[in-house]
């Protein structure tokens, strides 16, 4: 995420509208924060009530991975600030379709006595991924579009890889629930 967000996004803005780079990056960050926050809450709630043979979380993680690929490719093609904002916010929604269910999965599948350890492992992996993503992103500063495409495909791989490693059990036998505002 930070490979695109912290490195390639500002470089892309520089290509489109260099005279207003700081303002546009701030606009993108602000809009993305709102989209990500709302998406995390809503998608987390919907993943709680999802019933499928692949489990509650896995379908959202896979859909988020595919959506992240598509929205990053859309962002890469953006030629205006408006298109960048819409594509970037769409990416945040898709990215949170990976993050929210993944975090909920940890709560679902890990025994309470092991949650501290698993949370530490998750945090360690998160930090490595964030800084590693910036290192990878920086390799593409002279070819920003290529870098965004590479990062989009890396994000696409993340969901199926997580699903293969985790193997969430079916949720078809769980009692059905309906989405309510209380879930938010």
Give short role names for the model-derived ranges:
Residues 1-33:
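Helix-loop boundary and gating motifs at the non-cytosolic
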Residues 49-65:
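Cytoplasmic membrane-interface "Motif A"-like loop-to-helix N-cap segments
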Residues 62-79:
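C-terminal ends and interior cores of transmembrane alpha-helices
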Residues 90-124:
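Cytoplasmic helix-loop-helix junction between adjacent transmembrane helices
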């Amino acid at each position: 995420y930070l490979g695109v967000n912290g490195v390639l996004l500002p470089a892309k803005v520089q290509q489109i509208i260099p005279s207003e780079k700081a303002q546009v990056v701030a606009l993108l960050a602000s809009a993305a924060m709102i989209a990500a926050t709302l998406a995390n809450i809503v998608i987390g709630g919907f993943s709680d009530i999802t019933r499928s043979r692949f489990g509650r979380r896995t379908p959202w993680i896979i859909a988020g991975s595919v959506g992240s690929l598509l929205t990053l490719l859309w962002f890469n093609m953006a030629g205006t600030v408006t298109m960048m904002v819409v594509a970037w916010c769409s990416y945040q929604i898709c990215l949170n379709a990976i993050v929210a269910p993944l975090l909920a999965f940890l709560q679902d599948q890990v025994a309470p006595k092991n949650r501290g350890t698993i949370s530490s492992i998750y945090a360690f992996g998160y930090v490595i991924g964030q800084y590693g993503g910036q290192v990878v992103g920086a390799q593409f500063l002279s070819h920003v579009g290529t870098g965004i495409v590479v990062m989009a495909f890396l994000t696409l791989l993340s969901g199926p890889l997580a699903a293969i490693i985790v193997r969430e059990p079916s949720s078809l036998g769980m009692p059905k629930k309906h989405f309510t505002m209380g879930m938010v």
